[in-house]
Structure formats: structure tokens, C-alpha cells
């Protein structure tokens, strides 16, 4: 054998070896990081805390019982009549509970998370392996196995740009990507921030690709928890330099992460909804309404809007104007070019924006503000947005000055430490009190335009790198 042929054969064998190293036989892969592997010294910051799963669950139930008015330590015994009524109620609810459980663990899980189906994973395996090869060869991706607090093994891929951050320093910022219900990091939403020059950390839901377990909300949250800890404590990114990007159903884990770790730098939600119930009722028979609502609330309670309002940092919502997946509208066009007025009215991202602005700026969003923002959300293209913006004569400079003046005034008047968070003055802001209705409309439109960006794209269209932007900061 000639020297050249030997070298070619050696390169071929080496490539086969590399492919085997990051193939989907992930069981024998050594554990790189566990949820309790926190080597950084404790500073009292929430990014440094190490709550066990048992302690976290206990805390949740303590709060739940307290909200119901019960004594969690010593609960007095109920009367015999009360116990009988409780038993009868449980017996009456047992059939519906069993039906809900059966639906959630069979058809329900496959509908909510189709990417966890074994047949889909097998069918996509060649594409997933090609995606892994591309990330490793072109972007020097580093694969790692993380273990969550429930024992699930989470498959991750990290692309580090810190050595060559680029002219804008984007590589110093880490984007944690949360995929959709049929998305994998090998061929998912991480391509946009990756091509835009950011450092990127992708991971697969439990039951997706190399990750073990089943993709129920609590398992997803546990997986997200270990991913964030891995980014902060092993990859050593400062919390302020970490951006969480969630696409579609990935908005649940993205908002959970920023709610649990409010010191994280920013949140970007792409084609995300506020609540799963309206979307589930859209695709299921009307006669199943009671069962569907109960199943979603008990087993797939993806309360994205509630979690979003708990995050005090910068937020950007990306709404796709041709999205028929997260829309409850009945007149979505069949062709992308057939845009008609009202196509975006049923997009659940509208409710997400309204909930966010109402929580953060309640005085601005009272009556006139909510009405004008709802009208602005009906605009399905840039021309309609601009026309409505000009109609109300929104003065961006005045809006910025008003918001900054309110913040500076609060800095002088408020001495309470609870009024300040990792991103400055905590929400809600009561700016807008005393302003005229016209000024409140202008301020509401200004805030809506800063928090939501329209994209003329369908739900599954890949996001262009130039469309991935960091949220607006005051």
C-alpha cells in the first residue's frame, strides 16, 4: 500500500471513530456534569444555589398547602362527615383521573412531543448524525452528558466562540437553545444564533435523541435546570452573558429557566404560545373538551405566560405572521402569499405580549393602552405597523425620556432593597399615571414595538441569522 493510500485509509478510520464517539449509542458515554456538581463558591446569588429535587418539591407543596389555608405541619383531623365527602369526591373523580392519565401517557404525549417517538428518532437518525458531524467538524462542538436531579441523562452540544468573539463580541455571549416538540439540537433552532456568531449550548428534551426519560413538564424543567447549571458552573459564563432562546414549545423551558434564574441576561421567544389549552382544544374533538382541559392542566401545564411574567430582564418575542401552529384562528391562508387582514389575530403570541406588558406596565396598559396594542397586533406586515405607528404620532424620544425619568425618580425615592433586582428597578412600573389617554396610547405602542418583532415566516421555517437579535434594553 502506498503512503497516500495509507493516509486516506487512516483518515477514513479516524472519521468512523469520531462518528462512533458522538453517535446515538449514548449509554456508555461518561457523565460530564451532574446537577449537584457545583464547584463555584457560594455568594448568596440565586445562580449559586444548590436546591435538591426533594427540597424543591417540598417547597412547592408547602406553598401549595399554604395557599389553600392548610397547616403543613400539624393539620387537625377532619370530622367523619368531611372525610366521607372527601372519599366520595375522590371516587367520583377516579374514572376521569384514570382517563386523563391514560391519555397523557399515550396519545397525549405523542401529540405534544412527537419527537420522543421511537420511530421518528430512527427515521431521523441519519440526519441527526450528519448534524452532529457538522457541529463537531465545522464549529468544533463539544458533546457532553449531563445528569438531571431525576436521573435523566441529557444530551448537549456546546460551541465555544470566546477565543474568537468577533468584532461585536458576540462570542462572549452564550445562547442556550430550547428546541420545539419535534426539534433536536443537531438540526434545530441553534443554527441562527450559531451562524450569527454567538457561543451556543444546545440540548435535547428527555426522550429525544441521546437524552433519556420522557418529556413531561417536570422532567423538562429538571433538564433545563442542569443545563443552566452546566453553563454557569462548568462553562463559566457570567449569568449576565447568558441568553435563553426558546422556539415553539421550547418557550416553556426557556421561561422556566429565566423565572428560576432571574439573573440570566436576556430571553428570546420565537413562535411561542401563552398556554397550551387553547391550542389543544383546537385540534381535539369538541366532545373531549373536559378531558382535554383536565389532561393538559394535570400533565402538560405549560404555563408560559405565568412564568414569563416572573422574569425581570429584557424580553423579545418573535411572532411569525404565517404561523398556523400556535394560532387558534380559522382563516389561516394556505399559501404564504395569500395574506389577508386578520391572519395574525389568533396567534397566541399576542396574548403573551399583552400579559407581559400588563404585568410590567399596568398603568400604561389600562383600557386605552390595551386597546391600541390589540389593534397594533392585527398588523401582519411592516407597512401596516408603520402606518398605525404614524397614525398615533408616536414620539420615540419622548417615550424613552419618560421611561428613564420614571426610573431615575424611583432610584431617588425607593430605598427598599426588594424594589431592585438583578436588572435594576423591579416590575411592575407604574409609569403613565397622570398622563393623558393620547400619551398612554403612544407609550403602549412604543413598548409593544420594542418587545415584539414580526417575521414573515411559517412556524417551521428556519430563522435567518440576521433575524436573531437580543432584546431591547432601556
UniProtKB/Swiss-Prot annotation:
Catalytic residues identified in the record: 248, 323, 423
Catalytic reaction annotation: a 1,2-diacyl-sn-glycero-3-phospho-L-serine + H2O = a 2-acyl-sn-glycero-3-phospho-L-serine + a fatty acid + H(+); a 1-acylglycerol + H2O = glycerol + a fatty acid + H(+); 1-(9Z-octadecenoyl)-glycerol + H2O = glycerol + (9Z)-octadecenoate + H(+)
SUPFAM superfamilies cross-referenced by the UniProt entry: alpha/beta-Hydrolases
Family: Belongs to the AB hydrolase superfamily. ABHD16 family.
Signal peptide span: none
Any single GO CC term annotated in Swiss-Prot or TrEMBL for this entry: nucleoplasm
Protein name: ABHD16B
GO BP: any one term: lipid metabolic process
Any GO MF annotation of the entry: hydrolase activity
PANTHER family assigned to the protein according to its UniProt record, in alphabetical order: ALPHA/BETA HYDROLASE DOMAIN-CONTAINING PROTEIN, PROTEIN ABHD16B
Keyword Hydrolase part of the UniProt annotation: yes
Pfam families: Abhydrolase_1
AB hydrolase-1 domain segment(s): 175-295
This enzyme's EC code(s): 3.1.1.111
Keywords assigned by UniProt, alphabetized: Hydrolase, Lipid metabolism, Phospholipid metabolism
Function: Hydrolyzes the sn-1 position of glycerophospholipids with high specificity towards phosphatidylserine (PS), PS-PLA1 enzyme. Also hydrolyzes the acyl chain of glycerolipids with a preference for the monoacylglycerol (MAG) 1-acylglycerol, MAG lipase. Plays a regulatory role in cellular lipid homeostasis by modulating genes involved in neutral lipid degradation and in phospholipid synthesis and composition.
Tissues in which the UniProt entry reports expression: Expressed in most tissues, with highest expression found in the testes, skeletal muscle, and brown adipose tissue.
Top-rank taxon, per record: Eukaryota
InterPro entries for the chain: AB_hydrolase_1 (IPR000073), AB_hydrolase_fold (IPR029058)
Amino acid at each position: 500500500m502506498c503512503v497516500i493510500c495509507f493516509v486516506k485509509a487512516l483518515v477514513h478510520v479516524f472519521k468512523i471513530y469520531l462518528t462512533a464517539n458522538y453517535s446515538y449509542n449514548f449509554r456508555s458515554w461518561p457523565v460530564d456534569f451532574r446537577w449537584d456538581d457545583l464547584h463555584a463558591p457560594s455568594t448568596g446569588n440565586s445562580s449559586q444555589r444548590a436546591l435538591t429535587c426533594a427540597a424543591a418539591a417540598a417547597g412547592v407543596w408547602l406553598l401549595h398547602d399554604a395557599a389553600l389555608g392548610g397547616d403543613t405541619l400539624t393539620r387537625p383531623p377532619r370530622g367523619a362527615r368531611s372525610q366521607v365527602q372527601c372519599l366520595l369526591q375522590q371516587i367520583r373523580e377516579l374514572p376521569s383521573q384514570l382517563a386523563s392519565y391514560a391519555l397523557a401517557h399515550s396519545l397525549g404525549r405523542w401529540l405534544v412531543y412527537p419527537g420522543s417517538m421511537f420511530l421518528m428518532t430512527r427515521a431521523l437518525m441519519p440526519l441527526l448524525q450528519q448534524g452532529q458531524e457538522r457541529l463537531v467538524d465545522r464549529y468544533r462542538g463539544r458533546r457532553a452528558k449531563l445528569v438531571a436531579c431525576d436521573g435523566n441523562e441529557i444530551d448537549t452540544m456546546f460551541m465555544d466562540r470566546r477565543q474568537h468573539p468577533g468584532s461585536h463580541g458576540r462570542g462572549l455571549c452564550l445562547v442556550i437553545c430550547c428546541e420545539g416538540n419535534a426539534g433536536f439540537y443537531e438540526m434545530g433552532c441553534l443554527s441562527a444564533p450559531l451562524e450569527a456568531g454567538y457561543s451556543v449550548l444546545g440540548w435535547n428534551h428527555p426522550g429525544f435523541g441521546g437524552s433519556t426519560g420522557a418529556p413531561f413538564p417536570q422532567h423538562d424543567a429538571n433538564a433545563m435546570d442542569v443545563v443552566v447549571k452546566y453553563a454557569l458552573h462548568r462553562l463559566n459564563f457570567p449569568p449576565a452573558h447568558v441568553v435563553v432562546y426558546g422556539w415553539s414549545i421550547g418557550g416553556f423551558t426557556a421561561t422556566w429557566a429565566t423565572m428560576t434564574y432571574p439573573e440570566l441576561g436576556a430571553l428570546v421567544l420565537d413562535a411561542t404560545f401563552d398556554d397550551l389549552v387553547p391550542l389543544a382544544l383546537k385540534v381535539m374533538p369538541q366532545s373531549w373538551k373536559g378531558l382535554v382541559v383536565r389532561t393538559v392542566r394535570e400533565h402538560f401545564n405549560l404555563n408560559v405566560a405565568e412564568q414569563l411574567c416572573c422574569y425581570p430582564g429584557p424580553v423579545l418575542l418573535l411572532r411569525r405572521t404565517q404561523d398556523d401552529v400556535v394560532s387558534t384562528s380559522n382563516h389561516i391562508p394556505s399559501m404564504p402569499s395569500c395574506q389577508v387582514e386578520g391572519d395574525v389575530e389568533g396567534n397566541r403570541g399576542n396574548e403573551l405580549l399583552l400579559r407581559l406588558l400588563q404585568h410590567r406596565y399596568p398603568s400604561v396598559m389600562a383600557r386605552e393602552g390595551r386597546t391600541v396594542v390589540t389593534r397594533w397586533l392585527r398588523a401582519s406586515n411592516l407597512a401596516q405597523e408603520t402606518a398605525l405607528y404614524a397614525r398615533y404620532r408616536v414620539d420615540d424620544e419622548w417615550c424613552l425620556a419618560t421611561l428613564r425619568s420614571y426610573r431615575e425618580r424611583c432610584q431617588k425615592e425607593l430605598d427598599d432593597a426588594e424594589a431592585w433586582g438583578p436588572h435594576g428597578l423591579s416590575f411592575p412600573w407604574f409609569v403613565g399615571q397622570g398622563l393623558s389617554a393620547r400619551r398612554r396610547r403612544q407609550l403602549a405602542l412604543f413598548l409593544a414595538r420594542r418587545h415584539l418583532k414580526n417575521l414573515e415566516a411559517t412556524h417551521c421555517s428556519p430563522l435567518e441569522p440576521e433575524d436573531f437579535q437580543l432584546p431591547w434594553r432601556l
